[in-house]
UniProtKB/Swiss-Prot annotation:
The keyword Ligase applies. This is Arginine--tRNA ligase. It comes from Azoarcus sp. (strain BH72). Its EC number is 6.1.1.19. Belongs to the class-I aminoacyl-tRNA synthetase family. HAMAP family: Arg_tRNA_synth.
């Protein structure tokens, strides 16, 4: 028998329905906890649901259902309330049974049955052109926690990072590294303001020099600048000046490719691998892992980009204008049509994105979840439109948006960037407040809500700090169990009937709700629901701990209370693990 009272009550109600209205025996039963404790432990509106199709008064129908409800010693009281609700008050044994179930199942309590549903979650996928910043951190924490929640709920999950290793941004990184490298050999090319500025580029240049000396420095300043339009004065911010800077950058990239020749792919690969490796290490330290790192370049190498565009063309969704190929995305709800292949023959980023999603569908996932920054909201219609245009079901793709996190210190909004103009990095944040606080605070709100990240609160060792408060509850249980020093088997044999007071029964009810919270968090893509649950569970435990002694003289009462405490510890540890947070045994 399940210790979940909802399962028990649902079975009882369905049995009654088979007698009263067999044609409606498969009706979904909704059970909720009443807001007022005086209304019992659970209430259902099934009589209100069926009153109209059965042409019966809902209160009369509720009374009929109660008359046919099988007797159960786990239900203490039933009543018809209000317009036709049925309230249930559970017997103490039904409430405390969850303790034994938690102790028996351990880390598997709350784990959902295998659903045979393949889910792909793609997240972070930051351009490997610089260190991960605090914005990437929220996407990483959310994506990792969501993946773990889905996995715990019973889904077959693949965690994926899309590596943007093709295209202009990587060329700009390679150029930036090479120009800084040349400067180490006295070749001082004026550094473009639209190249990558961070100190990490200088560090990469030094690494390139240390590994290969002056192998890539056999050029002159004139050769590097040959044919470029030059840079406008820094004060100019007009569109013409911006365009000139972009043309100058493109000219430098073309010259780098020509002058380096066969060595250009190596410099390009060196810069990519340095940044990608740094990002991997950063995420690994953050407890964020991926099953697959998917290369954008592979889409071109395998011809999938060309095949995807050709398929759209074959289906009549492509037209040519001014030498470029355009996708008719306005036919699918987008605000304007989009270029997929430029007049120079190069494919756009959107084209590779179409190919990547085609690849996801061809890999046979039942559900595809993309986690994007909230600023990419407008990108959704064109991607879903392309999927539909390829003859694939766009509803299989779901996009979860992540808002940026804002840092606060001393109650004041703090700068999100350093002197060099770079965003505060994820590594800097982790080093200041710790991994646990980062992982927990990042998922304290719905992903599409703005997040105010209070640095002082995240570092504080107080009850106001939610992660500290939860971890402290876990450590408190560990301390009590260590003082006791007995064997786990003694707790599994405890007489749970000794759990009688209001706080103990409330804790049992909270524990029993964990499996439902897991399924809800998975269904809503909302790991914050587990964070909220853990805060409530910790609050219930601290309240009980402060009011009652665990190690009392009465052996039966002591074992029952220790069993309840051990069950709380198990669920706290399991819930924190799903969120990527540790559960220390002492604090």
């Amino acid at each position: 028998m399940s210790a979940d009272p909802k399962v028990l009550l649902t079975d009882l109600i369905k049995t009654a329905l088979k007698s009263v209205a067999p044609e409606h025996a498969d009706t979904a039963i909704l059970l909720e906890r009443p807001k007022q404790a005086s209304h019992g432990d659970f209430a259902t509106n099934v009589a209100l649901q069926l009153a109209k199709p059965l042409k019966r008064n809902p209160r009369e129908l509720a009374a009929l259902l109660l008359a046919e409800l099988p007797a159960s010693n786990l239900v203490a009281k039933t009543e018809v309330a209000g317009a036709g609700f049925i309230n249930f008050t559970l017997a103490a044994a039904a409430k405390t049974a969850v303790v034994g179930e938690v102790l028996a199942k351990g880390a598997d309590f709350g784990r959902g049955a295998k659903k045979n549903v393949k889910v792909q979650v793609e997240f972070v996928s930051a351009n490997p052109t610089g260190p991960l910043h605090v914005g990437h951190g929220r996407g990483a924490a959310y994506g990792a926690s969501l993946s773990d929640v889905l996995c715990f709920a019973g889904y077959d999950v693949t965690r994926e990072y899309y590596v943007n290793d093709a295209g202009r941004q990587m060329d700009i990184l390679a150029l930036s590294t090479w120009l800084r490298y040349l400067a180490l050999f006295g070749i001082d090319v004026p550094f473009p303001p639209n190249a990558y500025q961070g100190d990490y580029v200088i560090d990469m240049a030094r690494g390139l020099r240390d590994a290969h000396q002056g192998r890539y420095a056999g050029v002159t300043l004139a050769q590097v600048l040959e044919g470029t339009p030059g840079l406008p004065v820094a004060e100019r911010k007009d569109d013409e000046a911006k365009q000139q800077r972009e043309l100058h950058l493109d000219g430098l990239i073309a010259n780098a490719k020509r002058l380096l020749g066969e060595d250009y792919p190596f410099v390009h690969g060196f810069a990519l691998n340095e940044q990608l490796g740094d990002g991997r290490d950063d995420l690994q330290e953050f407890g964020v892992h991926f099953d697959k790192w998917f290369s954008e370049k592979s889409l071109f190498d395998t011809g999938l980009v060309e095949r995807a565009v050709a398929e759209l063309e074959k289906r009549g969704h492509i037209y040519v204008q001014d030498g470029a190929k355009w996708f008719r995305s306005t036919d699918f709800g987008d605000e304007k049509d989009r270029v997929v292949q430029r007049e120079n023959g190069l494919y756009t980023y959107f084209a590779s994105d179409i190919a990547y999603h085609l690849n996801k569908y061809e890999r046979g996932f039942d559900r595809i979840i993309d986690i994007w920054g909230a600023d990419h909201h407008g990108y959704i219609p064109r991607v879903k439109g392309a999927i539909a245009a390829l003859g694939l079901p766009p509803e299989k793709l779901e996009v979860a948006l992540v808002q940026f996190a804002v840092l606060y210190r001393d109650g004041q909004k703090t700068s999100m960037s350093t002197r060099s103009g770079e965003f505060v990095t994820l590594r800097e944040l982790r080093r200041e407040v710790g991994n646990d606080a980062c992982r927990f605070f990042y998922v304290l709100r719905k992903s599409d809500q703005h997040l105010d990240f209070d640095l002082d609160l995240a570092k504080s060792q107080s009850n106001e700090n939610p992660v500290y408060y939860i971890q402290y509850a876990h450590a408190r249980v560990c301390s009590v169990l260590n003082q006791w020093g007995g064997e786990p088997a003694e707790l599994q044999a405890a007489d749970l009937g000794k759990l009688e007071n209001e706080r103990e029964l409330a804790l049992c009810a909270r524990l029993a709700g964990f499996p439902e919270v897991v399924q809800g968090a998975a269904a809503d893509y909302a790991p914050h629901q587990i964070a909220f649950y853990l805060k409530d569970l910790a609050a219930d435990f601290h309240s009980w701990y402060n009011a009652e002694r665990m190690l009392v003289d009465d052996e039966a009462v002591k074992l029952a209370r220790l069993a309840l405490a051990a069950a709380v510890r198990s669920v706290l540890r399991g819930g924190l693990a799903v969120l990527g947070v540790s559960a220390p045994e002492s604090m």
